[in-house]
Design a protein with these regions (language model features):
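Short, Lys/Arg-enriched N-terminal segments with co-localized hydrophobic residues
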Residues: 4-23
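Conserved TIR/SEFIR loop-to-helix hotspot centered on a Trp-containing motif
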Residues: 139
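A charged, well-structured terminal subsegment
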Residues: 173-176, 183-194
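Nucleotide and nucleotide-moiety/phosphate-recognizing core
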Residues: 20-136, 145-161, 166-178
Length: 194
C-alpha cells in the first residue's frame, strides 16, 4: 500500500460518498504451488503444489511464462461468488527450500500484500487425499514454508495443505522423510490424482 494510493483514494472517496476507502496497490491475488523444478521431481509427493497449480492452470486457462528466472507465472481471472477476482498463478523454479525468493519477488514486483497470497504445498502430517486450509501459523517443519516466512517477513498468508501421508519414523527418520517426499505416489494413489 503506497501513501500516494491512499491519498488518491481518500480524495476520490470524499468527492463521491464521504466514505474512506483504501484500495490495495494491487488488487491481484498470488496463488503459488510449491515444488521442485525438473523432470527428476515430476510426480513426487513434494511436487503436490506444482500438480495443483497445473490443474488450476488448465481449469482457469492460464498460460505460464518465465518471471525473472525465479518462477513460471501466469495471470487469470476467476469468478468467485459473482465477483471477478484477478490472480497470478506461480510455480517457483528456485527449488523447494528457496521458494521464498520467488514468492517475495513476485509479491514485491506486483505489490501483493501477504494477506493476498495463497500457498499450496504438500503436508506429511495429513493423510493422502486430505486437504486443509489455514491462514498463518507455523511452518510445521516444511522448508518451503519456512523460506516464504523468512522472505516475506511474516507467516500471515493462507496455505492450502495437501496431505501426502508420513514416512516411517525411527532411527533414520530424516533420511526416511527425504526419501518419502522425493518419492513417487503408489499405484492406488496415482489413480486418485488428476
Amino acid at each position: 500500500l503506497t501513501v500516494e494510493s491512499v491519498r488518491l483514494n481518500k480524495t476520490r472517496a470524499r468527492k463521491n460518498t464521504e466514505e474512506w476507502t483504501i484500495i490495495m496497490a494491487s488488487d491481484f491475488w498470488l496463488i503459488a504451488g510449491l515444488g521442485n523444478p525438473g523432470s527428476k521431481y515430476e510426480g513426487t509427493r513434494h511436487n503436490m503444489g506444482f500438480m495443483a497449480a497445473d490443474v488450476l492452470a488448465e481449469r482457469w486457462s492460464v498460460n505460464f511464462s518465465d518471471h525473472k528466472g525465479l518462477a513460471m507465472l501466469g495471470k487469470g481471472v476467476m469468478n468467485l461468488s459473482g465477483r471477478n477476482v484477478k490472480f497470478f498463478l506461480a510455480k517457483p523454479l528456485t527449488y523447494m527450500n528457496e521458494s521464498g525468493n520467488a514468492v517475495a519477488s513476485i509479491s514485491a514486483y506486483y505489490q501483493i500484500e501477504p494477506d493476498h497470497i495463497v500457498v499450496i504445498h504438500d503436508d506429511m502430517d495429513l493423510d493422502f487425499g486430505r486437504i486443509k486450509v489455514k491462514a498463518g501459523g507455523s511452518a510445521g517443519g516444511h522448508n518451503g514454508i519456512k523460506s516464504i516466512d523468512r522472505s516475506l517477513g511474516t507467516p500471515k498468508y493462507a496455505r492450502v495443505r495437501m496431505g501426502v501421508g508420513h514416512a516411517q519414523r525411527g532411527a533414520h527418520a530424516h533420511d526416511n522423510t527425504v526419501n518419502w517426499v522425493l518419492g513417487g505416489f503408489g499405484p492406488d494413489q496415482r489413480k486418485q490424482l488428476p
